[in-house]
Amino acid sequence: MAKNEEIMNVQKAFSKNYLPLELLMLNDKLSNSLPNGGLPIKYKDTLSNDDVISLEISKQGAKKPIIMPVLLYYDDERVKLNTGKPWTPYDRAVHDACATLYEAGYEYFTADMVYRAMNGLTDKEKVSPQARGAVTKSLDKAMSIRLFIDYTNVQSTYKRGKNTEIIVDSQLLAADRLRAKAGGYEVTVYKFLRKPLLYEYNQTTGQILKIPNELLKTKSIKSTEDVIVIKSYLLRHIEAIRKNRRNNHIRYNAIYEELGIEDPEDRAIRGTLYRRRQAIHKLLN
């Protein structure tokens, strides 16, 4: 249980509870590269200089691509047994919600608050134990993964600072976890220790979508992990279509890849694919 002073701070923060009116979705090259093994996650005890990846960042009007050294790794040996899994599109959606809460001025937050931010819900709408558990696992994973990133060249190209060296090695989500009473219940509360790292980097490029809560609500369909991933993909792709009308098709296979479905032709998962297509149609309508 947190110390009395910390508990008072939590209760004070939640007494002023208000909800963000929109969700921030990070849409830069780094955030787009992380999910489903786009950037492999290494382990601290086996790291070498060869593991650093040179991520190529493009910018309209730039004379040449920007090279950004990046390394993603698990900081704790124990996660090999627990959460040593790739960063998924669902984890990305959770991180976007954390960035949203941080930007809205929250110092403390809960898994329920993250889920509500992901789905445009109010604090009156309940969160199921399953949904809370999925968010909690994702938060724990983000707190276990560290990102080394040198975005000095990006900073310079986007003219955010001259001759400024920006090298960061920190958790994707730097937060303390504590138990406290809020609203009469004992809950797990997280406290931001710094700005979520992907959001911090994103503010250099400014490639961010702001999605009104009305577009996040899925009353006609249960907001499962897969539905949240599909919804996030569709919102990003629709924004891309707005910018380039020639690329106005939504491919099922691209969504299947986002969901981690490797072989859509596998007859054993026909039922799963049918349900996912139904979800896509309902979300688009």
Q: At which residue positions do the language-model features occur?
A:
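Charged, alpha-helix-forming regions
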Residues: 1-285
